[in-house]
Design a protein with these regions (language model features):
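Nucleotidyltransferase catalytic core that binds NTPs
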Residues: 1-184
């Protein structure tokens, strides 16, 4: 039996195929999936010693809206009905704000890769959330990373094979790939 509501979160600072595996695994576990975009803006982005690069400006080049559009378009492209998911801000670094965006009584789905993942899991459990770990892997087991995709775009290397088709098209149509290269 699936959960009525599930919550999943990430920065999605380049929605890639690893993210899609994560999102679709979460959706398979619930009737309605709420996708939280962490670091939605600079006002709620904080430093964490467990993952210092996540708070850097160069690690957060996409706006909340751009990430929202890429997630929405890619899920629709994957056959998920629009009625089955919502996308909201998820200020993970300001836990006191989380329940303004997501229901505390939902099931929170996570994957564990590193110390930062473990810290977030402990934080959510400390807030009284029920957390389900979908899988635990090492960084070496990742399909790809947002960092890798961003670096490939900036350096002119092939990257379309690392992202959903919608993301590749959206990046080109909006000139985001060009913006990345110009800032390199």
């Amino acid at each position: 039996m699936s959960d009525p509501i599930g919550v999943i979160h990430g920065r999605f600072q380049m929605l890639h195929l690893g993210h899609m595996e994560y999102l679709l695994a979460g959706k398979a576990r619930c009737e309605r999936l709420i996708i939280g975009i962490s670091n939605p803006d600079a006002t709620v982005t904080r430093f964490s010693s467990a993952s210092p690069h996540r708070s850097l400006e160069e690690a957060n080049p996409l706006t909340y809206f751009e990430r929202y559009e890429m997630i929405r378009g890619s899920l629709l492209e994957s056959g998920v009905s629009r009625e089955e998911f919502d996308i909201v801000p998820f200020p993970v670094n300001c836990p006191e704000l989380l329940f303004n965006y997501v229901p505390q009584k939902a099931k929170f789905y996570m994957t564990l890769y590193d110390q930062w993942s473990l810290e977030k899991k402990a934080m959510l459990e400390g807030l009284g959330c029920v957390v389900e770990v979908m899988w635990q892997r090492t960084d070496a087991d990742r399909l790809t990373s947002g960092t890798e995709v961003r670096e490939r775009i900036r350096s002119g290397q092939p990257w379309a094979h690392l992202v959903p088709p919608f993301v590749y098209q959206y990046m080109a149509q909006q000139g985001i790939d060009r913006r990345f290269r110009e800032k390199a």
